[in-house]
Amino acid sequence: MLVFDAHLDISMNATEWNRDLTRPLEEIRNREALMLDKLDRGKGILTFEEMRKGEIGICIATQIGRYVALDNDLPGWHSPEIAWAQTQAQLAWYRTMEEAGQMVQITNRKQLNSHVELWQNNPADDLPIGYVLSLEGADSIITPAYLERAYAYGLRAIGPAHYGPGRYSPGTGSEGGLEPSARELLEEMQRLGI
C-alpha cells in the first residue's frame, strides 16, 4: 500500500523544533522530555522511520514563514525578508535530506508516476519519501516576482492564507478578503502553474 499525506510541516519540525527526523521517534521524545520552549515538546509523531512503517511514501511538504506586524502577537518573523530567509533554511533542509537519500522532490507527473511505481514494487524500509513542495501562507513571498524563483526550486502549491492576519490574505481567526497585493500574486501563481 502507498499512503499520500496531504500536509506535513516536516521541515519546520526539523529547523524550528530541532528534531532529527532520521532518528527513532522515542529518541526524539526522550530528548525533548525536559524541554519547555514549545507547548508540545516530547509529543512528536513524525520521523522518516514512522512514515515508512505507515507506508507514507508521498507527502505535501510545507515551507512556512509567517510575517507578523507590530500589532500582531502571534509567533512569526518581523519582516517578509526574514520570513523568506526562514523558508530558504527549510528548503536547504529538504535538499540535505535528498542528498542523504531520505527524501526525493516531485515536481511533475512523470516523477510522481515513477515514485508511485517505486513504492508499489519495493519494500518501504529504505525508500525515499517523495514530497511535493508547498508554501503554507504566502507571507514570505516578498513580492510576486519571487514566485518565479520559488517555482524554479520546486514550489508547486501555495495557500495564500494561513493563520491570523496575512500580507496577502487573512487566515484562520481573521476577517476580511484578499489584500490588493493578492491579485498580482494570484496572477503570477496562475501563470507559473502553482
Spans of model-derived segments:
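N-terminal hydrophobic targeting/anchoring segments and the immediately downstream early-domain regions
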Residues: M1-P180, E184
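Substrate-binding cleft of carbohydrate-active enzyme catalytic domains
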Residues: L186-I194
